[in-house]
Amino acid sequence: MKLKILHFTSGNKLHIDNILKKLKSKLSEFEYQFYISLMEYDENASRTDMKVFYVPNIFVANWIKSNHLESIIDAFEEESNNGVRPEIHIKVKEKKENVKSLKNNKSMLYFNTNGLSLNPFYTFENFVVGKSNEYAYTIAKLVLQQQASAYNPVLLYGKSGLGKTHLLNAIGNDVKEKNKNVLYVTSEDFLNDYMDKIKRKTMDSFRDKYRKCDYLLIDDVQFFGGKEGIQEELLHTFNTLHNSQKQIVMTSDKPPKEIKGLEERLRTRFEWGAMAEITNPELETKIAIIKSKCEVNRIVLENEVIDYIASNIYGNIRQIEGILSTINAHINLSPESSSLKIAKNVLKNYQIEKLEGITLDNIIKVVSKELNIKPSEIVSKERNRKVTFARRAVIYLAHSLMINSMNIIAKELGMKDHSSVSKALKAIKKEIAENSTTRNIIEDMKSKIQQSLDSV
C-alpha cells in the first residue's frame, strides 16, 4: 500500500516515499497496513515546519497520535534534517454524497432479504482497535482478502458488548459491495427458521437459503448448545459450505470447548479455522472509544472527565453510550456544575455490576502475579519498595472495585487501622497522577481482575 499524497510534485513524491520506507521498516506490518497506509499527505496545507495529514476517521487519528507521532517526526527529520510538527486531521465526506448513497443503494441497509438487516454503522472504519481486539480485527480483515483459505471458519469469541457483532457486520458491509451473497443471522433466528420450515414441510427452501450463500455469518453460536436436532442440521450446512469453498464466520461468548451440550463433531469444525478472542479493552482503547462516541454524538467533555470514565468502567463497553448520554443530560440541566463531579455521580449507578464477585483475594492474586511477588508478602510486615508498592496497589484496587470499608481492608492486610490504609491510598493516587507507567500498570491489573472473574 502507498501513502496517498494530495497535491504533490514529483520531487515531493520521492521525499514522501523515502519517509514511508523509513516508517515501514520501523513498524509492524499490522501498524503499517491498518494505520500508516491510510494517511493522506496534503502538500498545499503543509509548511517546512508543519506537515498536514488526513485520515479516514477519529480512531485512526487517535491511534496515530498516541502511538506513531514520534516515529513520523523522526522519519521527517532523518529525511530533511528539519524539525517538523505533524498535524493529523479527519477527512470529512460530503453529507449529500452520504445521503445519496443510502437512498440509491438498498444493500446499504439490507444485504439479504432472507436474513437479518445489516447495520450500516458497524464498519471497519469506526471499529476502535486496541490490544484487546487487535487479533480479531486482523482476522476479520484477512477474511475479506483470502476467502475460504486458512481462515475458514472464523470464530470470534468473548463476553457480551466487546465488539464481536460489530466485526461480523463490518465483514457483511464490506463483502456486500462485491456483489457476494451474504447471509447474516443469529443462532436463535437460525433455529426458529428451522422449526418453521419443518412445520411447513419446506426444508428444501431452508437448505437452499443457508447452503447457497457465499458468506454465512452467525451470531451467538453458544445458543446451539444442548439442541441436538438443530446441531445436526448446522453440521450438514457447515460441511456443504466448507466443501464449496464458502466462508463461515461465527461469534460466541465462549470458546467451543466451553459450550455445554455442543456435539464433538461440531466443536471440532468450529475449531478448524481461526479462533480469536476479544477481551476487556485496556485504558487507551477505552479512552479512544469514549472520544469517538463523544464526537459522533456531539458531546463535549474535558480530557480529565474522559480519563475518569475510562478508568472506572469495566467489561461491557456497550455501557459507554448510556453513560455518556446520562452525563451529557446532567451537564445540560446543570451547566454551572463541574463535569467531573457529574461524571462521578453518574458512574455510581454503574458500580453495583462492577463490584459483584470481586474479593480482596482476587485482587491480591492478580497483583502478586503481575508484580512477581508472593501473596504472603503483601499481607506481611515487610516494607521494602517492591512489597510496599504491591500493597498500595492492592489498597487502591480494593478501594476502587470493592464496597469494603477502610477498616476491613486494613484488617485483611494486617495493617494498624484505616488511617494507615488512607495514607497508603493517598500515596499511590499521587504516584498514579504523576507517573504514566504506574497508571498503566494499575489499569492493566484492573482489567486482569475483571477477566479473572469472567473466566470463573
Swiss-Prot record:
Q: Which InterPro entries match?
A: AAA+_ATPase (IPR003593), Chromosome_initiator_DnaA (IPR001957), Chromosome_initiator_DnaA-like (IPR020591), Chromosome_initiator_DnaA_CS (IPR018312), DnaA_C (IPR013159), DnaA_dom (IPR013317), DnaA_N_dom (IPR024633), DnaA_N_sf (IPR038454)
Q: Name one GO cellular component term.
A: cytoplasm
Where does this polypeptide localize? Cytoplasm
Q: Where is this region: Domain I, interacts with DnaA modulators?
A: 1-83
Q: Does the keyword ATP-binding apply?
A: yes
Record region (Domain IV, binds dsDNA): 332-456
Where does the UniProt annotation place the signal sequence?
A: none
Keywords, ordered alphabetically: ATP-binding, Cytoplasm, DNA replication, DNA-binding, Lipid-binding, Nucleotide-binding
Task: List residues binding ATP.
Answer: 161, 163-165
UniProt main location, coarse = cytoplasm
Which GO BP terms apply?
DNA replication initiation; regulation of DNA replication
- Region entry Domain II: which residue ranges? 83-116
Segments for region (Domain III, AAA+ region): 117-331
What GO molecular function annotations does the UniProt record carry, in alphabetical order?
ATP binding; ATP hydrolysis activity; DNA replication origin binding; lipid binding
Comment, domains: Domain I is involved in oligomerization and binding regulators, domain II is flexibile and of varying length in different bacteria, domain III forms the AAA+ region, while domain IV binds dsDNA.
HAMAP family linked: DnaA_bact
Q: Give the protein's function.
A: Plays an essential role in the initiation and regulation of chromosomal replication. ATP-DnaA binds to the origin of replication (oriC) to initiate formation of the DNA replication initiation complex once per cell cycle. Binds the DnaA box (a 9 base pair repeat at the origin) and separates the double-stranded (ds)DNA. Forms a right-handed helical filament on oriC DNA; dsDNA binds to the exterior of the filament while single-stranded (ss)DNA is stabiized in the filament's interior.
Self-association and partners: Oligomerizes as a right-handed, spiral filament on DNA at oriC.
Which family does the record claim for this protein? Belongs to the DnaA family.
Q: What is this protein called?
A: Chromosomal replication initiator protein DnaA
